[in-house]
From Swiss-Prot:
Belongs to the thioester dehydratase family. FabZ subfamily. This is 3-hydroxyacyl-[acyl-carrier-protein] dehydratase FabZ. It comes from Solibacter usitatus (strain Ellin6076). InterPro entries: FabA_FabZ, FabZ, HotDog_dom_sf. Gene3D superfamilies: Hotdog Thioesterase.
């Protein structure tokens, strides 16, 4: 039985199809959350990744983990309608096995450090009890009215440009 269903998740996260990557929340504590994503062949990334061997891109697995973390951060906030959880860092990401259509991706995230508006979380993603990915993500709580911070401009010397 789900603690949060898709409609409750949609009330918490701003993501929408095709980028809402959490279908249900199964467990939630103060510093830990478990969510699932049912991976289906109808998702747009499988058109090109890869046509003859559809595999969920690793970055989308990490995004699903980060969205699960975002539910934990935003769930108990009274003014969450005015907040966003921005992914600001990914560390120690490892992809162990491919995730394919028909899989149920289970994401478990735990807060390992929290300071003011920033939370660092460690997580694993599994399919049928087998670890398929792991990563640490850092999320920043921001007001929706704030413009997201831009990446610093990188200056490439003219002679190094391709």
């Amino acid at each position: 039985m789900a603690i949060l269903d898709i409609n409750e998740i949609r009330a918490i996260l701003p993501h929408r199809y095709p980028f809402l990557l959490v279908d249900r929340i199964l467990e939630m504590e103060t510093d830990r959350i478990v969510g699932i994503k049912n991976v289906t062949f109808n998702e747009p990334q499988f058109t090109g990744h890869f046509p003859d061997f559809p595999v969920m891109p690793g970055v989308m697995i990490v995004e699903a983990m980060a969205q699960t973390a975002g539910v934990l951060v935003l769930h108990s906030m009274p003014d969450r309608a005015n907040k966003l959880v921005l992914l600001v860092a990914i560390e120690n990401a490892r992809f162990r096995k491919p995730v394919v259509p028909g899989d149920t991706l289970r994401m478990e995230m735990k807060i390992i450090k929290r300071k003011a508006s920033v939370a660092k979380m460690a997580g694993i993603a599994t399919v049928d009890g087998v670890v398929v990915a792991e990563a640490e993500v850092m999320c920043k709580l921001a007001d929706k009215e704030e413009k997201p911070p831009a990446a610093p401009e990188i200056k490439v010397p003219a002679e190094a440009a391709v």
